[in-house]
């Protein structure tokens, strides 16, 4: 495999964009490679500018649950683009997607469309503060909720990959309004509420952490979070930008049967186009302008292209779709474990729906601290070997793999063979 054109493209890109990329994790720094530049994708496959084909487990970092260039989505996008890309006025397409979201997400009675997951979480935080008339927000260490100032505190994802505890440029007077505690730790959460309970506007959390790898909740943890917020008059915000329509047909909240006050969505609901949304109880959502005093707006919010791609994507998913993906995930996870046993590689695997986290450690991974016990050198060796075998994975230990309805049994078989080869070659 050669990557000469990607190397040349990156040399040009570093003079044009900071680090040569528009999102830090794409720089491939933690795996010791230059970025791979892609040009097209179809189904479960993606092709780089050197014409190397890969089985793709990045899927644009999660949105493409139907795979690349799904014919149903592409056809509808072609039709709507010919009619106009944005109007700055309401369209029926917004109603259509809103109805689907409200129907499938247990917590959402009303929804507001925005343009990114970061916009959704920032807006939900403002809404929670305005609704409760409190300032403090509680989040969990290693959880990434976008790059808004109040949420970029002890974040995971790209921040973890780059080894930064937080980001310069976040003022202390903003950071002090964010409390962090370890994920899956009820004792720390209880203590935080004993100290600050009457000042906490909301807990914002990923019901399954996806930006420290993949870390599901312990049994009863989400139920405890729901209980303690209700007990203290705080709101519970589920950041389901990643888990929404990935963990299940009714999102993670449906799977775990825990209903938050507000939910943030993104990724899958845009079918690969820029999108975000936040929604929840009617009495809370009606506090947003123009019906209420809490302001939020967006020039391209609810634009026809994103609404169309989102509607077609969600309309194409059924309960059976998730059963099929989960069966393929089972096979893939078993392949990882068999290879680890055969070549004596320490691994811990977490999964939630079509999300899979692979950690090179003997420890059970239940939070950010235990996620960081993963052997990053092993991960980098494994990653480079998988790329050479035509398997495209997220270039970070702290991101999960994603599967789609387009992945085939043959894709999984080829991937498992590549895993065996990669694990055999790891230098201990």
Curated annotation (Swiss-Prot):
<dbReference type="InterPro" id="IPR005814">
    <property type="entry name" value="Aminotrans_3"/>
</dbReference>
<dbReference type="GO" id="GO:0006782">
    <property type="term" value="P:protoporphyrinogen IX biosynthetic process"/>
</dbReference>
<dbReference type="GO" id="GO:0008483">
    <property type="term" value="F:transaminase activity"/>
</dbReference>
<dbReference type="InterPro" id="IPR015421">
    <property type="entry name" value="PyrdxlP-dep_Trfase_major"/>
</dbReference>
<dbReference type="InterPro" id="IPR015422">
    <property type="entry name" value="PyrdxlP-dep_Trfase_small"/>
</dbReference>
<keyword id="KW-0627">Porphyrin biosynthesis</keyword>
<feature type="modified residue" description="N6-(pyridoxal phosphate)lysine">
    <location>
        <position position="267"/>
    </location>
</feature>
<comment type="subunit">
    <text>Homodimer.</text>
</comment>
<keyword id="KW-0963">Cytoplasm</keyword>
<comment type="pathway">
    <text>Porphyrin-containing compound metabolism; protoporphyrin-IX biosynthesis; 5-aminolevulinate from L-glutamyl-tRNA(Glu): step 2/2.</text>
</comment>
<keyword id="KW-0663">Pyridoxal phosphate</keyword>
<protein>
    <recommendedName>
        <fullName>Glutamate-1-semialdehyde 2,1-aminomutase 2</fullName>
        <ecNumber>5.4.3.8</ecNumber>
    </recommendedName>
</protein>
<dbReference type="GO" id="GO:0030170">
    <property type="term" value="F:pyridoxal phosphate binding"/>
</dbReference>
<dbReference type="InterPro" id="IPR004639">
    <property type="entry name" value="4pyrrol_synth_GluAld_NH2Trfase"/>
</dbReference>
<keyword id="KW-0413">Isomerase</keyword>
<dbReference type="InterPro" id="IPR015424">
    <property type="entry name" value="PyrdxlP-dep_Trfase"/>
</dbReference>
<dbReference type="InterPro" id="IPR049704">
    <property type="entry name" value="Aminotrans_3_PPA_site"/>
</dbReference>
<dbReference type="GO" id="GO:0005737">
    <property type="term" value="C:cytoplasm"/>
</dbReference>
<dbReference type="Pfam" id="PF00202">
    <property type="entry name" value="Aminotran_3"/>
</dbReference>
<dbReference type="GO" id="GO:0042286">
    <property type="term" value="F:glutamate-1-semialdehyde 2,1-aminomutase activity"/>
</dbReference>
<comment type="similarity">
    <text>Belongs to the class-III pyridoxal-phosphate-dependent aminotransferase family. HemL subfamily.</text>
</comment>
């Amino acid at each position: 495999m050669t990557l000469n054109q990607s190397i040349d493209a990156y040399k040009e890109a570093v003079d044009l964009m900071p680090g040569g990329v528009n999102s830090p994790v794409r720089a491939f720094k933690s795996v010791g490679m230059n970025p791979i530049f892609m040009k097209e994708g179809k189904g479960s496959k993606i092709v780089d500018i050197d014409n190397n084909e890969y089985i793709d487990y990045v899927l644009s970092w999660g949105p493409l649950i139907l795979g690349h260039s799904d014919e149903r989505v592409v056809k509808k996008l072609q039709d709507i683009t010919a009619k106009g890309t944005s109007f700055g006025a309401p369209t029926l397409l917004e109603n259509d997607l809103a109805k689907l979201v409200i129907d499938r997400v247990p917590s959402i009675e009303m929804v507001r469309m925005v343009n990114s997951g970061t916009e959704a979480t920032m807006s939900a935080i403002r809404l929670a503060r305005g609704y409760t008339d409190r300032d403090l927000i509680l989040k969990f260490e290693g959880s990434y909720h976008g790059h808004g100032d109040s949420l970029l505190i002890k974040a995971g994802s790209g921040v973890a990959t780059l080894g930064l505890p937080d980001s310069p440029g976040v003022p202390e007077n903003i950071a002090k309004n964010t409390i962090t505690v370890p994920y899956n730790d009820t004792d720390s959460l209880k203590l935080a509420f004993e100290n600050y309970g009457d000042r906490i506007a909301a807990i914002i959390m990923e019901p399954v952490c996806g930006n420290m790898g993949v870390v599901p909740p312990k049994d009863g943890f989400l139920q405890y979070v729901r209980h303690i917020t209700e007990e203290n008059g705080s709101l519970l915000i589920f950041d389901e930008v990643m888990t929404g329509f990935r963990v299940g047909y009714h999102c993670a909240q449906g799977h775990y049967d825990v209903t938050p006050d507000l939910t943030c969505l993104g990724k899958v609901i845009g079918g690969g186009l820029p999108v975000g949304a936040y929604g929840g109880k009617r009495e809370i959502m009606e506090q947003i302008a123009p019906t209420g005093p809490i302001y939020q707006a967006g020039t391209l919010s609810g634009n026809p292209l994103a609404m169309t791609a989102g509607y077609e994507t969600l309309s194409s998913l059924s309960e059976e779709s998730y059963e099929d993906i989960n069966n393929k995930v089972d096979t893939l996870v078993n392949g990882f474990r068999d290879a680890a046993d055969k070549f004596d590689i320490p691994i811990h695997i977490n999964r939630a729906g079509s999300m899979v986290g692979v950690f090179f450690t003997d420890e059970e991974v239940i939070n950010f601290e235990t996620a960081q016990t993963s052997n990053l050198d092993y991960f980098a060796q494994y990653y480079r070997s998988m790329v050479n075998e035509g398997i495209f994975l997220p270039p970070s230990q702290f991101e999960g793999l994603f599967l789609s309805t387009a992945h085939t049994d043959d894709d999984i078989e080829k991937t498992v063979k590549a895993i065996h080869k990669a694990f055999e070659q790891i230098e201990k």
